[in-house]
Amino acid sequence: MNKIVLSFRTHSAAWITAALAFVLFGIVSFTNHILFRTYALDLGLYTNALYDYAHFRFADTSLFLPENKNLLADHFDLYLMLFSPLSWIFKSYTLLVVQCVAVIAGGFGVYFLLNENEESRPFRIWGMTIFYLFFGTLAALAYDYHSNVISAMAIPFFFLTVNRKAWGKAFALLVFMCLGKENVSLFLFFVSLGLFWKYFKWKESRKYILFFAAFSLLYFLVMVKWVMPTIAGADDFVHFGKYPVLGGDMTAAIKFIVMHPLEFIRLLFVNHMPENVIYNNEKVFFYLVLLVSGGWALFVRPWYFVMIIPIIIQKELTNQPTTWGCSYQYSIEFAPVVLIALMEVVSRWKWNVNRIGALLLFFTVSSTVYAFVERSKSWEKARFIFWQKPHFTPLYDLNGVKILMDRIPADASVMANSAYVGQLAYRDKCYAFPLVKDAEYMLISSTEATYPFTYEQTNEFIQSVQVDSTWQLVEQRDHVYLFQRKP
């Protein structure tokens, strides 16, 4: 059991499960991209970064900000550099392909981890399947690309190497995961604390796991307190501003948690931005979905609960209510941790394996369906509810948009609505509406993804361009306009 062997003959059931899962993931992810349900933030931004890295230059924030700053100041994500050569082949689909493959690999990590001992071995296919259908997994795949998904998929392999006491490989995986995003290292600090608790009886394990914890914490502090502020030319980590309820910086947050523990716990459950009434009870329903999907096992194996503490805090206390619920990529880290805790618990039950597995699968699918159908907002449903017709049905004829896109030269700078940026971003210069900058072309829809403008403001913008002597209308298709800057 010391080697991971992926022969089809030995692990045919796992390969078939993975193949079916990849088809499902493609239906979720690629369909959204084809139908313009991927956006400037974040797939467009990261695809534009791929282009820069593939041409041996640093990526910047010009796509979505007026000023041009190094993109590493926003998130210290080195995966984009690593994956950039693939963009020569897959273009705007590159990161979606990488993300789907990574999740498939994460399922194999679960499979081989459960294969380690006789008690959990009968559950390996069940565990793999449940992992793929977990609400956090599918929600992440339905929304663009994010590097924390790639990091999370290495967690089962990290657990596997720690369990085998393969400390060199475990450290290599730890470093790899840290490279995905600066806040992943904070998550890994708590993961290491949980593992320290789990393996406390083994002196050798304690020593190495404490080293992992120290490395993760040091990496996090160096990134957010020195490296990223230096790159940004700022005094502090820019994303601390998303947590005014905690004080807005790391020191204030720690002080608030220590001095007001009951209020801190209360805030994890209530809408702390009451002006957004549609998000009342959003956090409570998220916890309900998490418990039904297997989160109850975190209380039976509390060292796994320790691991998810920073994810809950960063998810539920931000001033962006869209992160509080079950949608988007903000629940992906729960997938490996909850699944592994769940399998550890049920593998000790003296019941029929298939009955247990089927019951767990029922609760997983039920919680996922509930999360997407009942907890997603009306404007999100077509993206997430992949088993219904609206997921495959565009709101308008997209052929006209694609014809207009084909008229834009590949080397031209372009500004477009957010929904179009995802497919246009693989070029030198691409800007999200309404940042015109030095764009040579503008592809604008009066109704599609007009944020941050209202429909009325967007129509006023289009009318102003039509009378602007520096622009000419190349072609109009229904509500979509292609403008070219005059020489």
Language-model features: locations:
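Membrane-interface transmembrane helices that cradle and orient dolichyl/undecaprenyl
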Residues: 118, 147-150, 155-169, 196-203
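Hydrophobic/aromatic-rich transmembrane helices and adjacent perimembrane loops
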Residues: 100, 186, 305-351
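Multi-pass, polyprenyl lipid-linked donor-dependent membrane glycosyltransferases
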Residues: 98-102, 126-162, 176-187, 330-334
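Extracytosolic helix-loop segments that constitute the early lumenal/periplasmic catalytic or substrate-binding loops
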Residues: 27-30, 46-71, 78-79
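Start-transfer (signal-anchor) and selected internal transmembrane alpha helices
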Residues: 1-27, 115, 121, 204-212
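Transmembrane-helix signature of polytopic, membrane-embedded enzymes
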Residues: 15, 94, 104-136, 152-153, ...
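Hydrophobic, aromatic-rich transmembrane alpha-helices
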Residues: 271, 280-308, 312
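Signature aromatic-anchored transmembrane alpha helix within multi-pass, membrane-resident enzymes
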Residues: 15-19, 122, 213-217, 348-378
